[in-house]
Amino acid sequence: MSDLTDLLESRLADGSDVYIDSGVNPSEYLEELANDIRLNACEPFELYAVVMAPGIPGFDDGEEISGMCVAKRGGRWLVYRAKEDRFYVFWGPRPEQLGAHGIFGSPLYCWSA
């Protein structure tokens, strides 16, 4: 298991930034998200995306950023950037056509977006 995989697993306990609708059991919902990330986890590999509206603090729209993909499903790519120690979501149908639309935070928050 890689250090990045271990880091991801350790961060799956933090759901403090996840929106949970009324009537939803928080612990069950967070566990479902964590299990879905585990199910869609991949061997980490580098990905690039173009920052797009609404943007990401510290980056200009149109700027290319990169990170290490740790999970992927249906056009959603969960990416970790060590420089900020933060997870992001890149969106797009193929690895060479990804946008970063301002979703960042815990892995659970990113995956729930």
Predicted features, each with a name:
Residues 93-113:
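Compact, glycine/acidic-enriched structural inserts
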Residues 1-59:
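N-terminal domain-onset segments
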Residues 41-99:
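Amphipathic protein-protein interaction modules
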